[in-house]
Amino acid sequence: MEKRIRELTSLLNQYRQEYYTNDNPSVSDQEYDKLYHELIDLEKEYPEYIQKDSPSQAVGGLILSGFEKYQHPFPLYSLQDAFSKEELEAFDRRVKSEFPKAEYIAELKIDGLSISLSYESGRLVTGATRGDGSVGENITENIKKIKDIPHQLKDDITITVRGEAYMSRSSFQKINLERQENGETEFANPRNAAAGTLRQLDTSIVARRELASFLYQEASPSQAQNQEDVLENLEALGFSVNKKRLISSSMEDIWSFITQVEDERDNLSYDIDGIVIKVNNLAMQEELGFTIKAPRWAIAYKFPAEEKEAEILSVDWTIGRTGVVTPTANLTPIQLAGTTVSRATLHNVDYIAEKDIRIGDTVIVYKAGDIIPAVLRVVDTKRDQQLPMPIPKVCPSCQSDLVHLEAEVALRCINPLCPSLIQRSLEHFASRNAMNIAGLGPAIVEKLFSAQLIHDVADIYQLSLDSLLTLEGIKEKSAQKLLDAIQSSKSNSADKLLFGLGIRHVGAKASRLLLETFGSVENLMKADDQSIAQIDGLGHVIANSIKNYFAKEEAKQLIFELKDKGVNLDYLGKKVDTSAQLFGLTVVLTGKLEEMTRQEAKEKLENMGAKVTGSVSKKTDLVIAGSDAGSKLDKARSLGIDVKDENWLLQL
């Protein structure tokens, strides 16, 4: 083994020299990675033979065994999207109803990967991906390879900042040319290339792919008065900040800026997919607050999707985890928004009928939300003798009759034993936002299901090395990795489990809200629908769905089986104390507080069980008003909402 380690060390150092110094690599990234992983595996097993000049020991590169989860100290919210001027005007009206003199700042929406950087005493200590907004991946070593991200700030401060890592168009073209010459699959677009690069385990690959960044937010408490100050502060600290922006109180000015940027976007050296409009004043931002998903003080205008013509060659009908049958068109390949597209969703049978879509039609294809290829309409002038689309009457997986339920647009398979439905449910359970079982993807699920090794999610936890090795193409090392991932998933917070169960209408955020309130899946099973419905952000639809799911004996049995197999049923995040003095109340803070900061007041209220929101409505239970309270206090009084002062809060 010592001889092989020496050989690999020498060979890889030669390849590194070719790449970094000579700019003339003789092997592909794929071949380099393969040899690199062989070396690192051997070095782990025989550490006594590690060479001093091993690439794994070099400053320029580091092999990572994987990425640890990282709990963000401050949530990374997504933004509300807008696709029209009318939606921006509606946003403007909402903001101006609270702050008539509000000023906006418009910034470019960089098409890259969201990152969060934490510094202590000016030193970079953590770089992480966004993940689900609460938990991301720690990619610090890769972040350090982005040249314009400082390792040490110009000021010895402790701060968390947010921004976007991206790949320039020139770097993207250079990398794809190299991959083409090496016979490797090309990246679809710069965003995919940037995302794939930051998940590399070999940091030297990250270094040579020349990523860049733009920072735009101080996530930790800021001394700045407005967003413009934030950007100037970030630049003064040594970060790269995009200089193309506009400040105005007029949405007409903002729209003119959007139009100008859209006309010029092809001349930029990097990709953008829209414009982000924020309330400039940070105090106003705090007053406006957040919904369950996004800030009320910002909106992301997305540029209209690019459209291309393609011919429908055939249609596939597939079953989702809830039994919904989705038609997908197979197309003549086209280049669309930087990717090659050969399939596009047709949504549902009602959509096909409404648009009169037929096999053989020439259609207009676009990317819905700039992500999912979809058929927009038929090019009628190019229709010949195409026949109406044949609609399936039976499930393509289990041959059961399909149903078209009243008030639904989708065909649905309602056979609980449908193989496709079960497999999709298993895939969902193992997915990243659910139980995050790495290695248990669609291909492995299909093999396990076909071999009758798993029938429901509880069966996942009785898989063994011997049973996995009976599957074709599964080696001992990959089987053990899968078992380790399964074992690790047992300790997930129970909101991940709840989401993984695939209960209708219960998404990831609803799962977290439910478990924050009830503390465990077992407590939730015993909860009445009224106590569920009163949780802010949920309602009766989700409450009924939860009640109906746990009313089924097989659902209860599944939970008990998972518990017996060691799966955690408790919520591991911060729980809501249902006995707290203000539990269940929706509270709004307004005006200037004298003895407390607004953040201190917010934290005290939340610790007492209240939900603090940014705007007054009929759902508001209480308003705490400081001095110089304005329109929110007036609105509270007009609605008959109870109003208290700061002294009342201090005495609680």
Curated annotation (Swiss-Prot):
- Protein's name according to its UniProt entry: DNA ligase
Q: What Gene3D superfamilies does the annotation carry?
A: 5' to 3' exonuclease, C-terminal subdomain (1.10.150.20), 6.20.10.30, BRCT domain (3.40.50.10190), DNA ligase/mRNA capping enzyme (3.30.470.30), Helix hairpin bin (1.10.287.610), Nucleic acid-binding proteins (2.40.50.140)
Instruction: State the encoding gene.
Output: ligA
Residues annotated as binding Zn(2+) are 395, 398, 413, 418
For this UniProt record, the keywords arranged alphabetically read as follows: DNA damage, DNA repair, DNA replication, Ligase, Magnesium, Manganese, Metal-binding, NAD, Zinc
User: What cofactors does the UniProt entry give for this protein?
Assistant: Mg(2+); Mn(2+)
Record HAMAP family? DNA_ligase_A
What is a single Pfam family found in this protein's UniProt entry? Answer: DNA_ligase_ZBD
Q: Which SMART domains does this UniProt record tie to the protein?
A: BRCT, HhH1, LIGANc
The record, for PROSITE patterns, names: BRCT, DNA_LIGASE_N1, DNA_LIGASE_N2
Q: Which organism is it from?
A: Streptococcus uberis (strain ATCC BAA-854 / 0140J)
Q: Which InterPro entries match?
A: BRCT_dom (IPR001357), BRCT_dom_sf (IPR036420), DisA/LigA_HHH (IPR041663), DNA_ligase (IPR001679), DNA_ligase_AS (IPR018239), DNA_ligase_CS (IPR033136), DNAligase_adenylation (IPR013839), DNAligase_N (IPR013840)
